Amino acid sequence: MIDTSVIIKALFSPSHRRAGTTYSRELKTHESCVALLAILDDRGIEVLIPRCGIIEIAAVSTRLTNSSISEEICNEVETSFTIVPEERLIAQAKKIALSEGCPGFDTYFLAISEQNLIPLFTDDLGMHRICERRTIHSWILRDIDLKSVIPDLK
């Protein structure tokens, strides 16, 4: 399970202007996101994304590029990953929202991980902390050592 932050950070290199003093950390995170997606693809590991993740990717990628490229990105995500409809997640996502008060889109990613007992890769520290509270196995990409995680990926 990957959060949209992983997809976006894999696709777009950090900008010196936007990243400022955190540029080196953001560049390392970008490289980790690219490497993670390559590993998942090379190993044929199914990656689940809630349908609403497509909307989040569309919004963020349009801000970073343009709507035409953003649409291409969304189409590629829809063909590369398994899209999970909200109907399969709504009850669990609602429980998570009621207990955690987290952003709405996040609840769908958390629901997939929790329902399917699969780990979540994210670069969203808030989502990672919710995972810790809920005992969802997760990794924060800015701190990850992929070599130590690779044996866990099945």
PLM region spans:
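Helix-adjacent hinge/juxtasegments
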Residues: 62-72, 78-84
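Short, well-structured N-terminal submotif of metal-dependent ribonuclease cores
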Residues: 1-49, 62-68, 149
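Acidic, PIN/NYN-like endoribonuclease modules and their adjacent C-terminal/linker elements
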Residues: 23, 82, 114-115, 119-154
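Structured helix-beta-strand junction loops
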Residues: 42-44, 79-80, 116
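Active-site neighborhoods of divalent-metal-dependent phosphate/nucleic-acid chemistry enzymes
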Residues: 82-126
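Alpha-helical elements of the RecA-like P-loop NTPase motor core of helicases
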Residues: 9, 59, 128-129
